[in-house]
Amino acid sequence: MLKGSIVALVTPFTKYGNVDYSELEFLVNKHCEAGTDAIVAVGTTGESTTLTHEEHIAVVNAMVELSAGRIDIIAGNGSNSTSEAVQLTEKMTQAGVSGFLNVTPYYNKPSLAGLIAHYQACADATDKPQILYNVPGRTSLDMTPDMVEQLAKIDNVIGIKEATGDVSRVQELKERCGDDFILLSGDDPTAREFMFAGGHGVISVTANIVPAKMKELVTAALAGDKESANQIDAELAPLHNMLFVESNPIPVKWSLALMGWVSANYRLPLTPPEESNQQLIESVLQKANLLNIQES
């Protein structure tokens, strides 16, 4: 299912900097048990920019195998080089992923014509659906609703992860792209309002640490149960805010380490949180009763 409660999963590393496949298996099992609808593998939260292409493909292959059909795996296939994005797409299609999350090419700021050509090339490389990913805070390119309308004409482009936090875009995207075009929030603090406005789910960082609770929030919001959704989101708000006190995925990986789920290992240029933020993260987790819950 490429909608609902989708986790943007971290990529765990050993102290030597290698991918920790044992911890990865633990995380995949956690999300299957919690009812998470899909996992995004090797996206922004998965530190995709510090993995080699070989590692990127290996992690996706492992997730498909570990999931064993229990949960959909959506692979990050974005790059600011179209040829590299196409190569990743071809390899991960062979792995058996359910679809792709394809971020706008970053740094080189292509025109609309360049974007169309880029996404068409990726579409030609697979028979799997693609979800566009708009995160201008990282890419310096805002994929506006009028641009999305043009990209949605590509056959296997079925939706967008909209990470601007601008809930007003939901209605405009629906009007331009139709009700069947999947709209996913990419911003945890505004995801509830995004779904109230007509969105179809969220690709969530917070779901890494509270997968079952995020599933409850999404289920309530999509069902129109505003009272329950508001109550759940109020409980989650301190977590939403804490997870972005530094660049994602620094706080979420530190949180998972304090919970006993993964080791607190990053790849440069990412480093552990500043000491003051380490204390903040621990305090928020303690108040939420999330410290040292490895077997819960």
From Swiss-Prot:
Name the species this protein comes from. Idiomarina loihiensis (strain ATCC BAA-735 / DSM 15497 / L2-TR)
The record places the site described as Part of a proton relay during catalysis at 44, 107
Q: Record's family?
A: Belongs to the DapA family.
UniProt-listed Enzyme Commission number(s): 4.3.3.7
Which Gene Ontology BP annotations are present? diaminopimelate biosynthetic process; lysine biosynthetic process via diaminopimelate
- Kindly list the GO CC terms recorded for this protein: cytosol
Annotated gene: dapA
Q: What class of enzyme is it?
A: lyase
The molecule here is called: 4-hydroxy-tetrahydrodipicolinate synthase
Location relative to the cell: Cytoplasm
